Every structure is written in C-alpha cells, then in structure tokens.
UniProtKB/Swiss-Prot annotation:
Its main location: cytoplasm. GO terms for biological process: miRNA-mediated gene silencing by inhibition of translation; mRNA catabolic process; positive regulation of gene expression; positive regulation of non-canonical NF-kappaB signal transduction; pre-miRNA processing; regulation of stem cell proliferation; RISC complex assembly. Its EC number is 3.1.26.n2. CDD domains: PAZ_argonaute_like, Piwi_ago-like. The modification Phosphoserine is found at residue 825. It catalyses: Endonucleolytic cleavage to 5'-phosphomonoester. It is found in: Cytoplasm, P-body. It comes from Mus musculus (Mouse). A divalent metal cation binds at residues 598, 638, 670, 808. The modification N-acetylmethionine is found at residue 1. This is Protein argonaute-3. SMART domains: DUF1785 (SM01163), PAZ (SM00949), Piwi (SM00950). Pfam families: ArgoL1, ArgoL2, ArgoMid, ArgoN, PAZ, Piwi. Residues 530-567, 758-805 are annotated as: Interaction with guide RNA.
Length: 860
C-alpha cells in the first residue's frame, strides 16, 4: 500500500486505508447489546436535487421553513404527493423524480416575517444525479464505499448521506438540532446550572455503515442552553445579585465586564412593542447607564439632537425606565449605535451555550446526566419506541424499516497484563476489573529524595505549622513504604502569598540549594498560583514541582498520599511499574517507539487563543518513560503543523536514551473526527516519514497510525445481568468488539479498557488508518489494552493508551504556560482569552520547556 504522489495538501491522492486483517479471537466471549438499530434500506435509486436559496447565509432552521413552505405551495404543479427530505443546506432527495427541466426551476417563496412583514425568498431547484442504494448494499457486504463520508461537501452524492437525511428530516422539523443531536425545551423538569444556563435533554442520532447493514446509532444526550428569561434576571444570575431592587448603584467595571462576556453574541427580543417581538443580537454592553447613554436622534424637521436612551423611551414609548442606572445592550452592528435598556429585553429561547461551563456548572451537569448503564439502556430503548419510526411519513416514503431492538454483539474480554514492581521481593500485581493495589509493593525503580522544599500558599491560619509537620511525616512514611524514600526534613519550608511571589522564591531556592530535587507547593483551592508555579518550574527555571490542595494536607488519606508518590517518583526519573516482559506482544522484540499525539483547541468564543499540539514518545523498552514536545498553532487547526520536527526530536531523544533506532513507530492520534481522517492522515504520515528521512536517508521504520476516538455515541451493555460490573452495572474492563457494529471492511475496533465508576462506560473507538507493520487484530487490540495499564498517575487501567493520554496532559499543561499574568486573571474576568497581545514567537517561547525539564515527565 502506497500513498499516491505527494501533491499539494489541497489535492489529496487516492489513499488506501488498510482493510481489516481478520478478527480478534483472544479473550473470554461476552454477550453484549449495542445502542445501534438496524435500518433496512430498499435497493432503489433516489433523486438528488441541489437547492439554492437567496438570500443565502440563512440559518438551517429558516432554510427548512422555506423548503417546507415551497413543497406545500407548489404541491399541485411540482411536488404532488411526494415527500422530499432536505438537509437544511443544499441537498434535497426524492423517492421519485420531480417534473422539472434539466436546467432546474426558480420558485418564489414567502415566509411570514416579524411584525406582519413578509420575507420573500428565491429558491432554485436543480437535478444533480441519481444516488444508488444498490451500491450501498454491495459496499456493506464488504465491497468498498463509493467515497468516504465527506460531510463537508455542499451537495453529497454519497448514499450514506442520503440515508442520514431521510432519518433526520422529521426530527429536524420538530426539535432544536445541535450537531447530530436533537433537543427540546424542558417540560415538567427543571435543571438550572446557574449563570443563566440550564440543562436540556435530547437524543443523538447518526447513521453508520456496519457489517452487512446500515445501523442507526441512538443515544441520550444533554447540553447546556441559555434560559429564556428577562435580561435583568439573566444579569442577576450571572453576577450573583439576589435582589435587583437592592442594587441602586450602576454596575462596577468588573461586573460590567463579566456581564458583557456572558451576554455578548446572544439573541434578545424586545418587550416594549406589544406583539412585535423583534429579535436582535447583542454586540456589547454600554459603559454608561441608560440615563447617560446618548445617541443622535433625527427629528421630523431634519435636525439631529442628542438624546439619552432613558429620555427617548420616555418620549417615544411613554415608558419611565425602572432601572435607568443600569447599562444598555448595544445590538445589531456596532457602528449603528442601537441601544436597548436591559429591562425591555428577554433572552430568546433555544440558544445553545457554546461557551465553556464553569467547574460548578460542569459538576452539576454531570450529576444531572450520569446514568448507570442499565438505566441508560432502558432510556435509549424508550427513546427508540417513542421516536416511532414506522409512522414517520418520510421514513415510509423511502421504504425504510428501523428495527426497535438493540443490536446483539459478541465481544471478548481481553486478559489484563501483569505488572512488575520492584523492591526486594519484586512483586507482581494482577489487575482485577481494571484496578490493582500498590499496598505492600515498592516502585520498580524508586528515587531517593535527599533535598526538597515546601512552599505553602495557604495562609498560616488555614494550614498551621503542626499540620504541615503532620503532612510531611505521613508523606515520608508512605513514600518509604513505596520505595521512594524522602530523607530528613525539607531544607526549606515557608509560607508565601500570591502568584507574584512564586518566581523570586523559586529563584532563591535554585540559587541557594544546589541539588534541590523537588518543591512541594500547597495551594489554597483554585488559584492563579498554580499556573505561575508551572510556568516558572517547567519553562523558566527547570525545577520539579508537585502541587497539593490544602484540604488534602489538613486531612491526609493514605490513598491521596500514595497517588502523590506515583506522580513524584515519575517526575524525578523513577519508574513506578512495568509490563511483565514475557507477556508483551511480539512488537517488543525489536526497538519500537510509541508516540501519542493530540491537539487541544481553545474554548468556543475564544477566537484569539492558539490551538496547542502535543506529541509524546516512549523512551525505553517497557514502555514507561516518555518525553514530550509541544507547539502552538493556528486556532482550530486539527493537523499538527510542525509534526515532522516534533517526531524528529523524539526519535533523537529515543536514540540518546536507548542507543537504538526504532524499527517501528506506533502512533496513537487522539482528537480527529471521521470527516478529517483522510486529510490529517495524508499530511501527518508524510510528516512522520519526513522526520525519519531527515535523520538518515535510508531510515524507513514501519509506521502504524491509529486514531483514538472517545467522542462518539456508541455504548455497549451486558446482555446478561450477571456479567455487569460495579455499582453502575457496566461492561468489564477489557471488553473488545470488532464485529457487527464496526466498519464493513476497514480495520477498526471498540475497546473499553477502564472500569466505569460513574455513569455508563464509553468504549474508545480505534481506527487503523495506516499499518506498515501488518498487525493482526489480536496483536493490536492486546497491545492497545496493555498500554492502557501503563499510565503512571493511578493504579487503574485508563480509557485510552498512556501515550495518547500523556499528549493530552502536555497540551493541557501548555495552556497554563500560556496564561498571561498581565491579562488573564484565573477567574477569566477578562473578555476573551488573552495571549492575543502576544505575537506567534512569544507564544512559541511561552510553551517551550526548560532544558532541565525537557527529558522528565514533568506533566505527570
């Protein structure tokens, strides 16, 4: 298999993704149910038309209303009793051809507008091609799909897209679509999140090609929406004001900034014009209150006068403002100076919250949405019954049948690897249900800590000296048991305050105590000190730091202290445990490097922050030690721009550490969605090859490129209740599926490698996009599962392989390195993310790790 000629990125060559090399056989069989429902599709052709609506750039909801109105209006002349389905953009499908000329037809459609005015639209409908579901049947039987599901093409001849549109047409008219999910306003339940937001429940629905058949993936889903309420109340929620009437003064600057950040970009409707509820988008909040905010008003005689907003509302609407001391919303285009007093505006219903939730909101959300596996299974079954596909007129029009029972699948529970510890007795731990115990065991290679310091950023009142003493004694006891002895008392133990004292203190420590190995930093809750400690320690001075929350110092538990030791040992160059060598797959017989890669994007609404790409690589044969590389790149760019130089660095580092050149590169890539598979693979595979060739022109190690996906909606349930594990009744750790619900012929599998503690476990989905090493299904599944046991932060198997997890941690840590002390306060009170005033060079320098830290696992 060879990639076509290396053309420009735009023109992608034909790319042969490897076919499945066979099925896995290892492990104990387990009967499962998957939330996939078989869709029977007739072997017919359907007709695709391109729809062009002018004015364009309307939201899909409006487009749907236009097309719906068009079908009703031109029923007699064009549509007859056909029921077309429409994707909200440019594709319209019919089961029978329409009587329109090959040149297409232009139609006029009007929708009732706001305030009694009609909105005119021009719609052109033009035949594009027939779409064959015969071909789809052949592909599902193991042929090849006509083309990958390119979801970004404007008019898609892809038969899978046609199936998807048929099944989404009715719900798109009935509910509020968000991505591939549908939501409706809460009725009979109320889940406020605070800050003017609330939880809406709904369902996810997507069509997936599976073996021999099409499957409909259905899952329960929840997301945050803004509560429809008066803007005054919204402001009170955002600013924690309990009673607006007790706020007789104008907003403070910091309050106004916080309120602006939340309401900017939202739609509001006005209440002072009777039934004419005009809607506007908020672009800003005025600095001045309504009583002082002026604008130029043109009088009937043509002269222009300055009026305050409060005056204008009194004169024009005989409305005496109740809160003239509050600011106004500036709406529409900034240059137009349209101001509305807060008290005449409501937040428009049905607006999804794309801004990042606060920590409290996130935890409320999880509590409201976490369901044990059996509950979720029941809820999904209920959803499918209530969706009632057999009565959906559009599903009937295209002769579909949707089964209403979940797909039965046979999975396998893979054996867990044994883990080798150190100490005199070199004990072995065998995980049970994804968990093992370190009690009575010592690290494989423990570090001796001779020189260490404590910096306490909690106040002396919060954390008295005897509490600190008790904590250090406990920590030393646990660390000695774990085989990582901390010798004697700290060489330095002082209280400090505020982020500004971090750098001078650390510089003093570095200059005074040569051979200082570790600084333990005690933090008083969520604080900007953390970001500063990591910036100074990781990037500026190259010092190992371990932060601990003060609550865990006051109330120590062996579990917390033991977890602390897991992190400290690794940061200082130790090895906690290794996979017992003789049970590892044969890929370990020659030098192999495991790479993990991830790109994290700034939260929505933060246009100015860069995306961060991280790649980590294993540095030994176990594999247990990793080295990290990190770069900033253009916001929202998924391809790792600088991958060639990052991989090159890691290969050099591997050679320095092991004196071997890897003969194989196993690359786990997180965070790529299916629509991007081909372009990301094309660019990144060539980049990895380029890195190899830049070291030696004949150096061509075999590359295996695997995408790891966690953000999908496939869930697996035990068919037999007795197999359920734990309080939430999940599938056992190690459950693997590579038949029935997987791709008809590509090499993919689901593996749930962790024990679900809360809610329903989400199996990770692995898709092999390139494989020079010709892995069998068993080898790759087992290797992947074993790597999930090598994550150093806990004694549990985690949900994705350690290298992919570490890449995520590295990128996440780099976000902290980018926090700009001058602008970013930890609460994020500043509008949008900073790091905007800094040029790309400054950003690149900010995430650069100090030479002394570079070779350590500082991110652990």
């Amino acid at each position: 298999m060879e990639i076509g000629s290396a053309g420009p990125i735009g023109a992608q060559p034909l790319f042969i993704v490897p076919r499945r090399p066979g099925y896995g056989t290892m492990g104990k069989p387990i009967k499962l149910l998957a939330n996939c429902f078989q869709v029977e599709i007739p072997k017919i052709d359907v007709y695709l038309y391109e729809v062009d609506i002018k004015p364009d750039k309307c939201p899909r909801r409006v487009n749907r209303e236009v097309v719906d109105s068009m079908v009703q209006h031109f029923k007699v002349t064009i549509f007859g009793d056909r029921r077309p389905v429409y994707d909200g953009k440019r594709s319209l499908y019919t089961a029978n051809p329409l009587p329109v000329a090959t040149t297409g037809v232009d139609l006029d459609v009007t929708l009732p507008g706001e305030g009694g005015k009609d909105r005119p639209f021009k719609v052109s409908v033009k035949f594009v091609s027939r779409v064959s579901w015969h071909l789809l049947h052949e592909a599902l039987a193991g042929g090849t799909l006509p083309e990958p599901l390119e979801l970004d093409k404007p008019v898609s001849t892809n038969p899978v897209h046609a199936v998807d549109v048929v099944l989404r047409h009715l719900p798109s008219m009935k509910y509020t679509p968000v991505g591939r999910s549908f939501f409706s306003a809460p009725e009979g339940y109320d889940h406020p999140l605070g800050g003017g937001r609330e939880v809406w429940f709904g369902f996810h629905q997507s069509v997936r090609p599976a073996m021999w058949k099409m499957m409909l993936n259905i899952d329960v889903s929840a997301t945050a929406f803004y509560k429809a309420q008066p803007v005054i109340q919204f402001m009170c929620e955002v600013l924690d004001i309990h009673n607006i009437d007790e706020q007789p003064r104008p907003l403070t600057d910091s309050h106004r900034v916080k309120f602006t950040k939340e309401i900017k970009g939202l739609k509001v409707e006005v209440t002072h014009c009777g039934t004419m509820r005009r809607k506007y988008r908020v672009c800003n909040v005025t600095r001045r209150p309504a009583s002082h905010q002026t604008f130029p008003l043109q009088l009937e005689n043509g002269q222009t006068v300055e009026r305050t907003v409060a005056q204008y509302f009194r004169e024009k609407y005989t409305l005496q403002l109740k809160y003239p001391h509050l600011p106004c919303l500036q709406v529409g285009q900034e240059q137009k100076h349209t101001y509305l007093p807060l008290e005449v505006c409501n937040i428009v219903a049905g607006q999804r919250c794309i801004k990042k939730l606060t920590d409290n909101q996130t935890s409320t959300m999880i509590k409201a949405t976490a369901r044990s596996a059996p509950d979720r299974q029941e809820e999904i079954s209920r959803l499918v019954r209530s969706a009632n596909y057999e009565t959906d007129p559009f599903v009937q029009e295209f002769q579909f049948k949707v089964r209403d029972e979940m797909a039965h699948v046979t999975g396998r529970v893979l054996p867990a690897p044994m883990l080798q510890y150190g100490g005199r007795n070199r004990t072995v731990a065998t995980p049970s249900h994804g968990v093992w115990d370190m009690r009575g065991k010592q690290f494989h290679t423990g570090v001796e800590i001779k020189m260490w310091a404590i910096a306490c950023f909690a106040t002396q009142r919060q954390c008295r000296e005897e509490i600190l003493k008790g904590f250090t004694d406990q920590l030393r006891k646990i660390s000695k048991d774990a085989g990582m002895p901390i010798q004697g008392q700290p060489c330095f133990c002082k209280y400090a305050q505020g982020a500004d004292s971090v750098e001078p203190m650390f510089r003093h420590l570095k200059n005074t105590y040569s051979g200082l190995q570790l600084i333990i930093v005690i933090l008083p809750g969520k604080t900007p000190v953390y970001a500063e400690v990591k910036r100074v320690g990781d990037t500026l001075l190259g010092m190992a730091t371990q932060c601990v929350q003060v609550k865990n110092v006051i109330k120590t538990s062996p579990q917390t202290l033991s977890n602390l030791c897991l992190k400290i040992n690794v940061k200082l160059g130790g090895i906690n445990n290794i996979l017992v060598p003789h049970q590892r797959p044969s890929v370990f017989q020659q030098p192999v490097i495991f790479l993990g890669a991830d790109v994290t994007h700034p939260p929505a609404g933060d246009g100015k922050k860069p995306s961060i790409a991280a790649v980590v690589g294993s540095m030994d044969a176990h594999p247990s030690r990793y080295c990290a590389t990190v770069r900033v790149q253009r916001p929202r760019q998924e391809i790792i721009q600088d991958l060639a130089s990052m991989v090159r660095e890691l290969l050099i580092q591997f050679y320095k550490s092991t004196r071997f050149k890897p003969t194989r590169i196993i690359f786990y890539r997180d965070g790529v969605s299916e629509g991007q598979f081909r372009q990301v693979l094309y660019y990144e595979l060539l980049a990895i090859r380029e890195a190899c060739i830049s070291l030696e022109k004949d150096y061509q190690p075999g590359i295996t490129y695997i995408v790891v996906q966690k953000r999908h909606h496939t869930r697996l349930f035990c068919a037999d209740r007795t197999e359920r594990v734990g309080r939430s009744g999940n599938i056992p750790a190690g459950t693997t599926v590579d038949t029935d619900i997987t791709h008809p012929y590509e090499f993919d599998f689901y593996l749930c490698s962790h024990a679900g503690i809360q809610g329903t476990s989400r199996p990770s989905h692995y898709h092999v996009l390139w494989d020079d090493n010709f892995f069998t299904a068993d080898e790759l599944q087992l290797l992947t599962y074993q790597l999930c046991h090598t994550y150093v932060r806990c004694t549990r198997s985690v949900s994705i392989p350690a290298p992919a997890y570490y890449a995520h941690l590295v990128a996440f840590r780099a976000r902290y390195h980018l926090v700009d002390k001058e602008h970013d306060s930890a609460e994020g009170s500043h509008v949008s993310g900073q790091s905007n005033g800094r040029d790309p060079q400054a950003l690149a320098k900010a995430v650069q790790i100090h030479q002394d830290t570079l070779r350590t696992m500082y991110f652990a």
